[in-house]
Amino acid sequence: MHVVILGSAAGGGVPQWNCRCSICSLAWAGDSRVRPRTQSSIAVSPDGERWLLLNASPDIRQQIQANPQMHPREGLRHSPIHAVLLTNGDVDHVAGLLTLREGQPFSLYATPGILASVSDNRVFDVMAAEVVKRQTIALNETFEPVPGLSVTLFSVPGKVPLWLEDASMEIGAETETTVGTMIEAGGKRLAYIPGCAGVTEDLKARIAGADALLFDGTVLEDDDMIRAGVGTKTGWRMGHIQMNGETGSIASLADVEIGRRVFVHINNTNPVLIEDSSERASVEARGWTVAHDGLTLDL
């Protein structure tokens, strides 16, 4: 199984377009300690030829250009991207669908709840139904979006997308609007969970034994954005678990047998983005890799 992390940042990327927090300031200055990062997306293939795109970032054209595996190679119109799978309806995971509208056939997979957030917005009708086949997938159903690649979706604690929030919103609910994925090929297993509000016993059981885990790395501490002075929301309010602390992802997953552990979907205010920081060193010392754009895994 071949895995390419196309975009490793959370919504807005690094640096964010209007941000001069301490981390974005380093990125704007071209400081080598903070790599620029695009918004959350990965691609997975069983053979290096046919690819499944997981989440369609607003930066998808830039990501395709930066990764030769994604380039068109045959005739006048071609793409090695055969299918797209959405793990939620967040803007940073669906806006890139509008870029993939140039008459290129592919299948779009999501749970009924996630797919409804796309289908109910007419702007996405630029993806003609006869060209882009929308496929509804139930939780715990195993399917093959690309031949040789088996995928199972499962609910994880989360919330509805920001643009669908209302008074009835429940943070941490396990529904079909935020899902994790288990991907299998060639006897190897990859768990991809870019958004998660908490680690449950069921989640730990599902990912146990995976050869690699790509997990929500939005915030180091729950109050990262508040400490940075650029926002008032906590990680929890945004539907994301913190890395640190007794209930954080590092401690909660420490006893789960997993191969490689990689943080993705990293917010611009997370200090682990600074490569020589004590925060980065602490995370790495506990067995985790901080993803960057273009990072590849061959399982």
From Swiss-Prot:
SUPFAM superfamilies: Metallo-hydrolase/oxidoreductase. Keywords: PQQ biosynthesis, Transport. It holds the Pfam family Lactamase_B_2. GO terms for biological process: pyrroloquinoline quinone biosynthetic process. Pathway: Cofactor biosynthesis; pyrroloquinoline quinone biosynthesis. CDD domains: PQQB-like_MBL-fold. This is Coenzyme PQQ synthesis protein B. It comes from Methylorubrum extorquens (strain CM4 / NCIMB 13688) (Methylobacterium extorquens).
